[in-house]
């Protein structure tokens, strides 16, 4: 369980690095999210997509270009909480977030709160893995630690 949790967190960090570098390299806004029928949705599960995002934001339209899609493990879920409360994370052409400082909680399966990881991102687009209290997460999710 620990290995799966570490792998999921590392995969998310790698995907965020990729998205930020694409925004910087191509000088275009790039969005990361879980897409359902072309719209960014919560919670992030099943798959994540990185795409060049022109208006309207948070949706993959004809003018947008999908850059990468990764599949998540079957029971994995990524919770994204940000200042602007959007279902997506958007990197600007300068590599920062669109005023979306926040955090991700990665869970490999329901009830696996003790193996969850937290990744914090700031407005400049930099992120770090942080410590957190599993009991606080359990209260947020309405689950018992396990």
What role is predicted for each listed range?
Residues 1-21, 25, 29-146:
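N-terminal helix-rich module
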């Amino acid at each position: 369980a620990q290995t799966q949790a570490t792998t999921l967190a590392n995969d998310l960090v790698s995907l965020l690095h990729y998205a930020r570098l694409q925004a910087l390299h191509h000088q275009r806004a790039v969005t990361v999210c879980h897409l359902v029928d072309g719209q960014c949705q919560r919670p992030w599960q099943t798959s994540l997509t990185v795409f060049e995002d022109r208006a309207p934001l948070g949706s993959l339209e004809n003018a947008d270009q999908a850059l990468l899609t990764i599949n998540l493990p079957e029971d994995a879920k990524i919770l994204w909480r940000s200042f602007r409360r959007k279902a997506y994370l958007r990197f600007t052409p300068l590599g920062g977030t669109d005023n979306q400082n926040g955090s991700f909680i990665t869970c490999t399966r329901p009830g696996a709160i003790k193996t969850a990881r937290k990744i914090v991102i700031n407005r400049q687009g930099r992120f770090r893995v942080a410590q957190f209290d599993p009991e606080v997460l359990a209260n947020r999710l309405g689950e018992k630690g396990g």
